Amino acid sequence: QWQGTEAVVLGCGGSARAVVAGLQQLPLTAIHVAGRRPDALDAFLKDLRADQCNDSVPLIAMSLDPERLSRVLKRSKLVVNTTPVGMQGHGDDKAMPLGRDLWTGVDSSVTLYDLIYTPRPTPWLELGQQHGCCTIDGLEMLVQQGAAALRRWSGREDVPVDQMREGALQSLGAHQP
């Protein structure tokens, strides 16, 4: 499904590093990384290029210029938001990464993955759903990170992932508007 396609990662922090490392395992033609601060973005990509295991997928720095973003988004099939924009309790809960206007024409063939897990769905994913996009929120990543940490800390392999997921859903449900 990802053969010959491009991906966009929004943000250049710690979670973006993990996302890019995962994306480098896919048969993508390019990974575009967008960040607000050019200095932070340059440092992020420099570190990644020094550390990366797979240099067959080009990493491309992308400014937040709306025209360039629009062109890149038109040819990308996966967009991952690693920023806190739109997260419940973090500024404007109705906010979307890069603003609503950029996403109003999103193609239904694009997969939108938001690492945020509350609210469910985020305003960005809700807009994507309205356009017929495949959308994924960050709950499963949260659960799997917790399971991996528990395995590592306890030495147990039989970690109750289903119970962890159910507990997370119950906890988030209690805090949903």
Stretches with model-predicted labels:
Residues 1-2, 26, 107:
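Short, flexible coil/linker segments at domain boundaries that flank nucleotide/cofactor-interacting
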Residues 4, 109-177:
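Adenosine-phosphate binding glycine-rich loop
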Residues 4-24:
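Glycine-rich adenosine-cofactor-binding loop
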Residues 25-30, 130-134:
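Conserved S-adenosyl-L-methionine
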Residues 28-52:
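NAD(P)-binding Rossmann-fold cofactor-contacting core
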Residues 58-135:
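Rossmann-like adenosine-cofactor binding region
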